[in-house]
Design a protein with these regions (language model features):
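TPR-repeat structural position
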Residues: 53-54, 89, 127, 169, ...
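"A position-specific structural signal for the A-helix of alpha-solenoid helical repeats
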Residues: 42, 76, 112, 116-123, ...
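Residue-level recognition of tetratricopeptide repeat
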Residues: 36, 69-71, 110, 143-147, ...
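Structural motif corresponding to the intra-repeat A-B loop/turn of tetratricopeptide repeats
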Residues: 50-51, 84, 124-125, 158, ...
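Alpha-helical segment of the N-proximal tetratricopeptide repeat
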Residues: 33-62, 66, 116-126
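Alpha-helical junction/boundary sensor with strong preference for TPR arrays
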Residues: 67, 81-84, 102-106, 141, ...
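Residue at a conserved register position within TPR or TPR-like alpha-solenoid repeats
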Residues: 47, 81, 121, 155, ...
């Protein structure tokens, strides 16, 4: 797309004031002509890290309506639609093209261009090479609250048959713990820290508490309630798990109505409904 006149100034001068961020969403500068687009992009990034791809897509799309040349919003559309169906193919390709064109322009911050590069590496070269790109990104911009979490997501390699975490798993835990020391209220970091223990042989009480903190960071997050339900189920609290999945269901329905989204695009609702049914069965109800 043709760059607007403001773009030459955007790298040096950010919008002076943006609307307040929702609970649990961390601040990061976003190059945009619209102060209102910045929190939308950051909400979208938080949704990506908490497994809410369609919600993320809606936020990034809303940001693009305010600023069609927002590089990070195009990046977000590409990220959130990676696993989407063929009905999103055209939009995914168009945003990828726009992201690549904008990332070549020196008016955009190097930080944002690095995000575009890391995504390109992921798509073209796979997760192993992408890990290197994300590591460089988070090491180069240590104040970025999101880069270490995307890196941690790629590092995850689970546990072996004896319950020992893999090297990537241990490094991911270390990274997320570092983020939480600096930003204890980060919903994305709390969610990621709990998620890292999801496939552990035994769920310790500390992990359940971390999942509860992720819910407290943003009580309107259906993903956080769903994740809490997983841990309550794993620890034998089937009634508590059912209640958590029901809360996730309700929030999914509320989101459908407020965003006018068809249920077919709300896969989180179906996941929560299925897990709640299993929890109810295990609870003997």
């Amino acid at each position: 797309p043709v760059l607007n006149a403001w773009k030459k100034e955007a790298a040096a001068v950010r919008p002076a004031q943006a609307p307040p961020l929702p609970p649990g969403v961390e601040m990061m500068a976003v190059c945009t002509s619209s102060p209102a687009a910045q929190p939308l992009v950051l909400e979208g990034m938080t949704h990506l890290l908490t497994f809410g791809d369609m919600k993320a897509y809606r936020k990034f799309s809303a940001a693009l309506k305010l600023d069609p040349d927002c590089l990070m919003a195009h990046w977000g559309v590409c990220m959130s639609l990676m696993a989407a169906g063929p009905e999103f193919q055209k939009e995914r390709v168009e945003s990828m093209k726009s992201m690549k064109e904008l990332a070549l322009h020196p008016a955009f911050p190097e930080h944002e261009r690095a995000y575009a590069d890391a995504l390109a590496v992921l798509l073209m070269d796979g997760p192993e090479e992408a890990r290197k790109a994300w590591k460089t990104l988070y090491e180069t911009w240590p104040r970025d609250p999101y880069a270490p979490l995307f890196y941690a997501m790629l590092l995850r390699d689970g546990f072996d048959d004896r319950g020992k975490p893999g090297e990537g798993q241990e490094e991911a835990v270390r990274l997320v713990d570092e983020v939480l020391k600096k930003r204890p209220g980060s919903q994305a970091a709390l969610f990621m820290r709990a998620l890292l223990d999801e496939v552990a042989p035994v769920i310790p009480p500390e992990t359940v508490e971390t999942a509860r903190r992720a819910v407290a960071a943003n009580p309107q997050s259906s993903s956080a309630h769903h994740l809490l339900g997983h841990f309550l189920f794993r620890t034998g609290d089937y009634r508590g798990a059912s209640a958590a999945f029901k809360k996730s269901e309700d929030l999914c329905v509320n989101w459908e109505k407020s965003e006018k989204v068809p249920r077919a695009l709300n896969d989180a609702y179906f996941r929560s409904a299925i897990y709640r049914a299993v929890s109810e069965f295990c609870a003997g109800r």
